[in-house]
Regions:
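Radical SAM/AdoMet-radical enzyme domain recognition
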Residues: 74-91, 97-211
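Short, solvent-exposed cationic patches
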Residues: 291-304
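Conserved alpha-helical substructure of the radical SAM core
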Residues: 1-127
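A short, flexible beta-alpha/helix-coil linker loop
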Residues: 61-65, 147-150, 215-218
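ATP/adenylate-binding site constellation spanning eukaryotic-like Ser/Thr protein kinases
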Residues: 52, 137, 293
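Radical SAM enzyme [4Fe-4S]-AdoMet core and its adjacent flexible, acidic
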Residues: 152-265, 274-275, 279, 283-294
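A generic "binding-loop/recognition-motif" signal
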Residues: 51, 147, 284-287
Length: 304
């Protein structure tokens, strides 16, 4: 934390630990009882389905690339969420940074919230890094599949070097960022190796979020889904790394034991896609509510 800009550190500490966790949690509990429904700790939003890459097995690709939530629609979701006690917002996509100007405006308007953004990082430049430094409440989670060969094979030739440049820029600006890594039946050993982990530490990452490959979306490849034995191997590797390395690791699927099982359906989070459909999970594309036709509370009270 000594390498993070002190004003950014202060803002994130207040927004995450006080607003999202202390104040927010008590408001969520109150509203769960009041409205007899789940109220999430975090809301995932797709600002857009557009993306500048075309990655193998992308769960978001089935939406196409022409859907968008407007600035006012995202702003309304955040306003409604804060009334329920939600101060943590996570952007997925598409590539959220194709809407970088709107995202910065939302950071400015809702300076009491934390905004985490899953991004391929290829659109992070010095101007945007300076804007992040100014608003202080935006954290990228950068997608990497391991080394250069593994990343480029899924995300396109030259992607890895663009990502590394973005990581170096963020580190130079003293901005916190993390990594999002998808492990498969092919890369699960490499992506949890000491070599990979140490390289991320050296480049200034502060956390890593692991997801196992889900065969949905564009050009899905079921053979890449890790088998139970491979998932068990990753389970133990992540716990070893978490205990021995200064880079905090989270495993989206295998850490369910720490949060009482599945967190979807508004229990701890929900997903709103770029068409406004409210899904229980980013990997479960079923919805009977659209944020353009109902309030956030009404969506939470719906059967799905």
């Amino acid at each position: 934390i000594h390498d993070i800009d002190p004003e950014v550190m202060k803002t994130l500490a207040v927004n995450f630990f006080i607003n999202a966790s202390l104040i927010g949690w008590s408001k969520q509990e109150e509203n769960r009882a009041k409205y007899n429904c789940n109220v999430p700790w975090a809301i995932l939003l797709d600002p857009t389905s557009a993306c500048n890459l075309h990655c193998t097995g992308c769960w978001a690709a089935e939406y196409g690339n022409k859907l968008n939530l407007t600035f006012d629609e995202i702003d309304s979701i955040i306003q409604q969420g804060k009334k329920l006690g939600v101060y943590m917002y996570i952007y997925t996509g598409g590539e959220p940074l194709t809407r970088k100007n709107d995202l910065i405006r939302l950071c400015e308007k809702h300076n009491d919230c934390v905004f985490l953004c899953f991004t391929n990082a290829t659109l992070i430049d010095e101007k945007f890094a300076d804007e992040m430094l100014r608003v202080k409440n935006f954290i990228p989670a950068i997608s990497l599949e391991g080394d250069e060969v593994s990343t480029d094979s899924r995300r396109g030739q030259g992607t890895y070097q663009k990502v590394v440049r973005a990581m170096k820029l963020l580190h130079e600006k003293k901005l916190p960022y993390g990594i999002s890594s998808c492990y498969t039946s092919v890369n699960y050993e490499k992506i949890t190796s000491d070599t990979y982990y140490n390289s991320l530490i050296d480049m200034g990452a502060y956390f890593i979020w692991y997801f196992h490959y889900m065969p949905v979306g564009n050009d899905a490849a079921p053979e890449l889904l890790p088998n139970p034995k491979q998932r068990e191997t990753v389970y133990h590797r992540i716990r070893h790394l978490r205990a021995t390395k200064p880079l905090f690791a989270m495993d989206f699927q295998n850490d369910a034991e720490y949060v009482g099982g599945c967190i979807a359906g508004g229990k701890r989070y929900l997903h709103i896609n770029a068409n406004g459909d409210v899904d229980p999970c980013v990997f479960v594309h079923y919805s009977n509510a659209n944020i353009r036709e109902c309030t956030l509370l009404e969506a939470l009270q719906s059967p799905i």
